[in-house]
């Protein structure tokens, strides 16, 4: 076990030996020591700012008593009681609510390009005018990074208010600068490889070697954001800092001396507001300049030779740097960065340097000597070095309001949405309202209009083709195949767009993060953490991005479990199937029938989680450490653009995948093996293929070859189930559907549709995230579970006399 017992600065009171998990709500205290059996977890806690000497405020405990929420360094952090119990506190006192005395900082105009006071280290030769430039856009989670990327490139990437929206790198070209491209990297808190995002971001900068880094900082919380900035500076790449959300800082009465800040850091700092598109032009000018002239940060050293530790860490880092310089140059790793990572015990950097045993022993001796002289362990020493430097910089450059309007508003909202007795009811009301508006009010009304419009188009096309004297086979292909098949799917476009609109609003507002906080204890019983709740909630919209978003989960156990369970959450592509069959067979109870399917999916997911957690994924519970962002009003532009993107994707799918599937299905059901037009569909090619699978589904009550064929095409895209049934039956009226299903077997069919794999794209997402073997395992697991559950429902129905 790694443990520290450092004397914190600024002790107050006489309380000692108090653990963070027992701190009363509304009380402040100072961190005395941090312990953990997991070295990587402990480093992550330190990187988040929970270092010895840090003052913390207990904000609340989750409605079920765990996890807890604390405030430190200007932001909210959640962690579980088990982890909080390893953090010792001293100096417990009541929260200081009085006005904070800050030295005033006058308003100074930010210097234009070339007029700054920072001192970069420029290369001897500049890159030629018009040479290709590539930028890496890096920053903390939830700091406006993707919003800035959209402003720089004109793209419409999804912008949310939940940590970890960007789960993969996104590339784009800077507007009006065709020679300049930018990559939006996943949001991270440090360059320590705690999560997959941090590994992706770090390896991109080290391996791809972008011409410059654009580091975006949340100006409302500079102290926490600068922690990553210092590590990026150690990479010794040309760099510019985008100080985002400056409009919020000034609106709350705060100020930042930008000129002094960039002078102290040795890096150009440009104040911007990405949401309002302010300062973007100046940022681009500075970024192009530092990249073209290869201006690297003016300083790389943040530990003073005469610091509180007597210069022990300074001597340690410089000693290691001298020892490994040749190895670092050969491995193309910046020397200063490599030295600090060796102090941390970073295995990836250690392997890349190819150090021999004698060199490793020498480095360990240097680090051990530093720990003895500094009176603390290596991880705490590095974190304290960075935060001490940051504290000095912020003390000279930043005036913070005692409490921002955004935080005051968030605290008031959280009294209801995360309150002990109101959180769960509020969640149920919100989700119930979302589904009611989607399926019963707005979506249903718009769907009716869409159905009328498409029916009119099909009727007009049929009449026109008849009047033109078109061949009956060709007319059948156009009307019965393409128009009817694709049109039946397009009628569900309004419902899907409305659902995505509501999910976007919940995520953009910051509520998703609160749901993870509230639900963590529940999910822990199933072997998951609260962070897994968000990917599964996204899965109600689309399984593919939900699976991709599991990359934000720090634990491989958590990630694999979530990937395995997310497809059981009913995605929006299944809505057309539910809507058609529930509307046909349960016209008086369409919404309850559809909601019951969602509940079955959740229940099956919970049962599967319990089984997997006790078998294939047996192990200790994963940590839950997450930032809680302030609530923000959802951006109308962002919400509308997301809805438009989803509508565009759906329409594209309808006119590509579903169009092709419809044509293939029409062809197979129109011709026999000799390519003669069949009078009886049971003699068609499609009937022969469907009959191969039908016996497997017969015990479930729908052994009809048409049902099995629809399920097979549904693997391409779930909407294809509807287009296939439409083509095979010639219509989707209750009368037509009743020739194949009874109300009971229709419901069993829906249960199977709910639980078997959503689509080929979702399996492809599993393959890209976890590999081919795991993708095959997920596919087999879902098909097996779907068959078993459908069989149980069918058997129970027979026993109850429902069949």
Task: Tell what function each PLM region has.
Residues 568, 572-595, 761-771, 792-803:
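Transmembrane helix-loop junctions at the membrane interface of multipass transporters and ion channels
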Residues 111-190, 208:
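Conserved G1/Walker A P-loop phosphate-binding module
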Residues 373, 377-381, 400, 441-482, ...:
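Extended, low-charge hydrophobic alpha-helical regions
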Residues 426-437, 499-504, 582-584, 598-612, ...:
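Hydrophobic core segments of alpha-helical transmembrane domains in multi-pass membrane transport
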Residues 417-517:
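Core alpha-helical transmembrane segments of integral membrane proteins
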Residues 177, 202-269, 577-578, 582:
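Conserved C-terminal guanine-recognition region of P-loop GTPase G domains, centered on the G4
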Residues 452, 456-460, 513-541, 618-642, ...:
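Juxtamembrane inter-helical linkers in multi-pass membrane proteins
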Residues 240, 250-402:
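Alpha-helical transmembrane helix bundles of large polytopic membrane transport and channel proteins
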């Amino acid at each position: 076990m790694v443990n520290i017992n450092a004397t914190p600065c600024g002790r107050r009171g006489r309380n000692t030996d108090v653990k963070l998990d027992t701190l009363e709500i509304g009380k402040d205290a100072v961190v005395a020591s941090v312990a953990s059996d997991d070295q990587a977890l402990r480093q992550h806690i330190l990187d988040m700012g929970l270092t010895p000497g840090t003052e913390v405020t207990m904000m609340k405990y989750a409605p079920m008593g765990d996890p807890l929420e604390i405030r430190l360094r200007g932001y909210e952090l959640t962690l579980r009681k088990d982890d909080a119990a390893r953090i010792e506190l001293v100096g417990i006192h009541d929260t200081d609510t009085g006005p904070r005395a800050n030295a005033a900082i006058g308003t100074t105009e930010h210097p234009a390009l070339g007029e700054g006071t920072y001192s970069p280290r420029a290369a001897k030769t500049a890159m030629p005018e018009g040479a290709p430039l590539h930028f890496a856009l890096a920053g903390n989670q939830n700091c406006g990074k993707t919003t800035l990327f959209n402003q720089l490139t004109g793209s419409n990437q999804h912008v949310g208010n939940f940590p970890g929206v960007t789960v993969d790198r996104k590339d784009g070209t800077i507007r009006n600068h065709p020679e300049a491209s930018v990559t939006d990297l996943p949001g991270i808190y440090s360059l320590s490889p705690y999560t997959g995002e941090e590994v992706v971001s770090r390896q991109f900068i080290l391996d791809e070697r972008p011409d410059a880094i654009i580091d975006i900082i949340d100006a409302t919380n500079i102290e926490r954001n600068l922690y990553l900035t210092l590590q990026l500076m150690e990479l010794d790449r040309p760099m510019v800092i985008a100080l985002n959300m400056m409009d919020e800082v000034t609106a709350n009465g705060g100020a930042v001396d930008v000129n002094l800040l960039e002078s102290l850091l040795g890096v150009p700092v440009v104040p911007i507001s990405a949401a309002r598109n302010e300062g973007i032009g100046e940022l681009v000018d500075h970024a192009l300049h530092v990249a073209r002239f290869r201006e690297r940060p003016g300083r790389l050293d943040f530990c003073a030779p005469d610091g509180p530790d007597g210069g022990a860490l300074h001597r340690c880092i410089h000693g290691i740097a001298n020892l490994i310089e040749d190895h670092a140059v050969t491995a193309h790793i910046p020397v200063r960065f490599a030295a600090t990572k060796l102090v941390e015990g970073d295995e990836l950097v250690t392997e890349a340097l190819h150090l021999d045993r004698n060199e490793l022993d020498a480095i360990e001796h240097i680090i051990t000597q530093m720990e003895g002289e500094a009176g603390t362990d290596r991880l705490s020493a590095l974190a304290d070095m960075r935060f001490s430097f940051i504290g000095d910089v912020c003390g000279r450059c930043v005036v913070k309001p005692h409490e921002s309007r955004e935080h005051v508003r968030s605290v008031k909202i959280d009294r209801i949405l995360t309150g002990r007795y109101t959180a769960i009811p509020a969640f149920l009301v919100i989700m119930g309202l979302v589904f009611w508006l989607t399926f019963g009010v707005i979506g249903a009304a718009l769907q009716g209009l869409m159905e009328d419009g498409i029916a009119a188009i099909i009727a007009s096309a049929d009449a026109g083709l008849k009047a033109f004297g078109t061949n009956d086979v060709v007319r059948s292909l156009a009307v019965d195949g393409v128009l009817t098949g694709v049109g039946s799917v397009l009628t569900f476009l309004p419902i899907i767009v409305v659902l995505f609109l509501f999910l976007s609003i919940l995520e953009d507002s910051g509520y998703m993060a609160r749901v993870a906080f509230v639900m963590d204890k529940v999910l822990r019983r199933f072997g998951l953490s609260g962070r897994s709740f968000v990917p599964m909630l996204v899965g109600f919209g689309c399984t593919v991005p939900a699976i991709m978003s599991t990359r934000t989960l720090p634990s491989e156990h958590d990630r694999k479990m979530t990937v395995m369970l997310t497809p059981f959450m009913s995605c929006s592509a299944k809505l057309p199937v539910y809507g058609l069959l529930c509307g046909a067979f349960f016209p008086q109870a369409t919404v309850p029938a559809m909601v019951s399917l969602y509940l079955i999916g959740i229940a099956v997911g919970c049962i599967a989680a319990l089984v997997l957690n006790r078998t294939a994924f047996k192990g200790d519970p994963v940590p839950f450490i997450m930032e809680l962002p302030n609530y923000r009003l959802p951006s109308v532009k962002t919400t509308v653009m997301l809805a438009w993107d989803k509508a565009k994707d759906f329409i594209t799918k309808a006119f590509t995948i579903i169009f092709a599937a419809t044509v293939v299905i029409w062809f197979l059901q129109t011709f026999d093996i000799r390519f003669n037009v069949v009078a009886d569909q049971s003699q068609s090619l499609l009937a022969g293929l469907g009959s191969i699978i039908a016996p497997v589904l017969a015990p479930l009550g729908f052994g009809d070859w048409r049902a099995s064929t629809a399920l097979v095409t549904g693997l391409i895209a779930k909407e294809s189930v509807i287009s296939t049934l439409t083509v095979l039956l010639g219509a989707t009226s209750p009368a037509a559907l009743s020739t194949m299903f009874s109300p009971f077997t229709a419901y069993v069919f829906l249960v199977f549709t709910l639980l078997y794999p959503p689509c080929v794209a979702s399996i492809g997402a599993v393959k890209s995230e976890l590999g081919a073997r795991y993708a095959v395992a997920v596919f087999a697991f879902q098909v097996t579970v779907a068959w078993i559950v459908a069989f149980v429902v069918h058997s129970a129905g027979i026993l109850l006399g429902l069949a």
